[in-house]
């Protein structure tokens, strides 16, 4: 599986939905030895028994997240995970927009990589492509989670920036595969 950001700040939502699923997949592969050897900064917007997310962005960010939903809830290793992201794009997202993604297992950094949002949307054949015009977006993506995801707590930190290096989106995703 290629390390394509599917949680990436939602090229206009498709890439965020995709990044959320892929981040879990990446973490499982990195730790499990697989082929690739998760509101405005005041707390979790959504909390389940095994996952939560924090919209750490500002009201002035180009992308405003409304919700992230997963099915099945909680995510199950070895099964498909469908992620639906809703949000508003406040300003046009142009070529050159990028996100920095960090995947951690506890305090251990497993992956830190920068992704070009528009390139990733093209490679993923996403329904939303650059330039992304302002407006509301809902995107659903399905990814296969690896069976070998270890029983551990993962965090996926996403920081997105416009072509002008202005804040675009900020998302922290936390997934706990220790719970049953």
UniProtKB/Swiss-Prot annotation:
Entry-linked SUPFAM superfamilies: E set domains
Residue ranges annotated as propeptide in the record: 21-43
GO-annotated biological processes: intracellular sterol transport; sterol transport
Origin: domain of life: Eukaryota
Keyword set, alphabetical order: Lipid transport, Signal, Transport
A Pfam family it matches: E1_DerP2_DerF2
Gene3D superfamilies associated with the record: Ganglioside GM2 activator (2.70.220.10)
Similarity remark: Belongs to the NPC2 family.
Function recorded in the entry: Catalyzes the intermembrane transfer of phosphatidylglycerol and phosphatidylinositol.
Protein's name according to its UniProt entry: Phosphatidylglycerol/phosphatidylinositol transfer protein
């Amino acid at each position: 599986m290629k390390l394509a950001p599917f949680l990436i700040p939602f090229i206009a939502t498709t890439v965020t939905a995709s990044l959320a699923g892929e981040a879990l997949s990446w973490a499982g592969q990195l730790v499990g030895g697989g082929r690739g050897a998760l509101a405005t900064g005041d707390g979790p917007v959504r909390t389940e028994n095994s996952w939560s997310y924090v919209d750490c962005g500002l009201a002035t960010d180009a992308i405003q997240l409304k919700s992230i939903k997963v099915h099945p809830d909680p995510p199950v290793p070895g099964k498909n995970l469908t992620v639906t992201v809703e949000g508003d794009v406040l300003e046009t997202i142009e070529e050159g927009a990028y996100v920095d993604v960090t995947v951690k297992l506890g305090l251990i950094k497993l992956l830190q990589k920068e992704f070009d949002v528009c390139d990733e949307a093209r490679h993923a054949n996403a329904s939303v492509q650059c330039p992304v015009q302002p407006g509301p977006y809902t995107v659903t993506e399905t990814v296969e989670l690896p069976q070998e995801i270890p029983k551990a707590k993962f965090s996926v930190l996403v920081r997105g920036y416009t072509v002008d290096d202005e804040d675009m989106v900020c998302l922290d995703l936390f997934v706990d595969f220790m719970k049953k």
